[in-house]
Curated annotation (Swiss-Prot):
Claim: ATP-binding is one of the keywords in the record: yes
Function description: Synthesizes selenophosphate from selenide and ATP.
Kinase among keywords: yes
Protein name listed in UniProt: Selenide, water dikinase
Gene Ontology BP terms: selenocysteine biosynthetic process
NCBIfam families found in the cross-reference section: PRK00943.1, selD
Organism: Yersinia pestis
Keywords: ATP-binding, Kinase, Magnesium, Metal-binding, Nucleotide-binding, Selenium, Transferase
Cofactor requirements of the protein: Mg(2+)
Complexes and interactors: Homodimer.
GO molecular-function terms, A-Z: ATP binding; magnesium ion binding; selenide, water dikinase activity
Feature type site, description Important for catalytic activity: K20
The reaction(s) this protein catalyses: hydrogenselenide + ATP + H2O = selenophosphate + AMP + phosphate + 2 H(+)
Chain sites annotated for binding Mg(2+): D51, D91, D227
Length: 348
């Protein structure tokens, strides 16, 4: 008799980037009265909530350092490993860099799940590292009450081409490289409401490496770049706006989304992170419908890149996207700050 399939999501209270501590609570945790250590070679720290730290090692080269880890968002161990690795490596691409090495972070409930299952998880992470052209060079593990996997990733970038989330300019168009709705579809699967024709869509979206980010870095007109993960599109766009001193207009109908997300929202397939996200930054957003809120605040795991692009660089961005098999269209634009308007406004 065959043993029953393992459902990893049943062993964790959270899922993927939806496990993130909310922005509001995180602000309290990170607040400090201590004087910060100043290092002139640290080009990007945590002041602007960027995707990774960047350190200038000289000769125009910066070292990128980042880490990301979470609990299972899918049941299959190998796919969990793939998704966790893709998500962690993405932060390097979001800074405009190329990954060169990774080490694993593993928490495993050894009294509940066999080590052979953890091996499959690590194999999934190793597979993605090979796709990215890097070694999974080591790691650290602990006995934990819930399964956790992530990577600490090192990358390199030209110091002239670092893409921060705080350098966007008014007049930039906004582009998004992956569709929204990952949290919604994975919640539908967890609730056994996912239709057969939609199985695997979210997983394959999450497993797409954000490699184009390393190529977008060569375009000066890409003024800011970040990846859309646990805080949802509105959360990560608000970080760009606040860091850059600009405001945004989003065209809801132009935003790419996974199939049938509106139907799944109507069926109650909304992750808990959506509400926590809105509670943290909803006061910054203009009027929007409940449906728009559920999609735009949906926590993404291993989501796409969000780019702010000057008008004269749009063609270059679209050309690079085409080389990677993507077709990109603007989903909104950035405007000068105006206290009479919301930080982000949603139009049809």
């Amino acid at each position: 008799m065959a043993s029953p399939a393992i459902r990893l999501t049943q062993y964790s209270h959270g899922a993927g980037c939806g496990c993130k501590i909310s922005p509001k609570v995180l602000d309290k945790i990170l607040h400090t009265e201590q004087q910060k250590f100043f290092d002139p070679r640290l080009l990007v720290g945590n002041e602007t909530r960027d995707d990774a730290a960047v350190y200038d090692i000289g000769n125009g080269v910066g070292i990128i350092s980042t880490t990301d880890f979470f609990m299972p968002i899918v049941d299959d161990p190998f796919d969990f490993g793939r998704i966790a690795a893709t998500n962690a490596i993405s932060d390097v691409y979001a800074m405009g860099g190329k990954p060169i090495m990774a080490i694993a972070i593993l928490g495993w409930p050894i009294d509940k799940l066999a080590p052979e299952i953890a091996q499959q998880v690590i194999e999934g992470g190793r597979y993605v590292c090979q796709q990215a052209g890097i070694s999974l060079a080591g790691g650290h593990s602990i006995d934990a009450p819930e399964p956790i996997l992530g990577l600490a990733v090192t990358g390199i970038v030209s110091t002239e081409q670092v893409k921060k989330n705080s350098a966007a300019k008014p007049g930039c168009k906004l582009f998004l490289t992956k569709p929204l709705g990952i949290g919604i579809l994975t919640t539908a699967e967890k609730k056994s409401k996912l239709r057969p024709e939609h199985r695997g869509l979210a997983t394959e979206t999450m497993c797409q490496l954000n490699k184009p980010g390393a190529d977008f870095a060569h375009i000066p007109g890409v003024t800011a770049m970040t990846d859309v993960t646990g805080f949802g599109l509105l959360g990560h766009l608000s970080e760009i706006c606040q860091g850059s001193g600009v405001q945004a207009i989003l065209h809801y109908s132009a935003i790419p989304r996974l199939p049938a997300v509106e139907d799944y929202i109507a069926e109650g397939c909304v992750p808990g992170g959506t509400g926590r996200n809105f509670d943290s930054y909803g006061h910054l957003i203009g009027n929007m419908s409940d449906l728009q809120k559920q999609l735009l605040c949906d926590p993404q795991t291993s989501g796409g890149l969000l780019l702010a692009v000057l008008p004269d660089a749009e063609a270059d961005v679209q050309a690079i996207a085409a080389q990677h098999g993507m077709t990109l269209s603007p989903i909104g634009e950035l405007t000068s700050a105006d206290s009479r308007r919301a930080l982000i406004e949603i139009v049809v």
